[in-house]
Amino acid sequence: TALPICMEDVSDHALALMLSCLRHIPLRDRGVREGKWNIQADSFRLKGKTLGVIGAGRIARALIRKVSGFGFAEVVAYDPYISAEQLAEIGVRKVEKEELFRISDIISLHLHANAETNGMICKETLALMKPTAILINVSRGPLVKDEDLLDALRGHRILAAGLDTHNHEPLGAQSPFCQLDNVVLTDHTAYSTAEGVTELKTKAAQNVVDVLEGRTPRYPVNHL
């Protein structure tokens, strides 16, 4: 494998989606291009907000490190596999899932899709969220029940969503998500930067060189 990789890239993208949602950057960009000005859309600052991360692995920790300078009131996390003491070491308070949904202004997903996590973002969890909250998904599409999220966005029961991963890819221009102004959509490329691709190729090549020269590969899967 070439892992760990793309932690910086995906966490950068999560932060970019947060800012895009809070400041309505795509909406304002389109408006200016169409000749509009003084576009009416309430924007919000990051300072004083509560960030909730679901899944506190490498990418989430990279994001937590990056947001430390934005003045968040608190960063909380739900991860059943990481102790409260471990999270406290990086300045994060461990909470239960329901509390995270209730108190967070921004919820960022950083976990694998499996039988336990698929459909985690659903009618019940969306109902717990603040009407000013935003959801960020740079992980996996199946974590979200699309119809439930669409209903919440259409009804303005949450402020916005920033989605890089989707249940159906490519998403397609006819997707209901494309009809909404309170969604920022990208094409499952959170991992893709010039530096990230170079790192991927370098690590993969290093594994080959290690084997050919009789060494244990530097990035074996069972060492993750």
Model-derived segments and their meaning:
Residues 77-81:
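Conserved acidic E/D residue at the C-terminus of a beta-strand in Rossmann-like folds
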Residues 69-74, 155, 159:
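Conserved S-adenosyl-L-methionine
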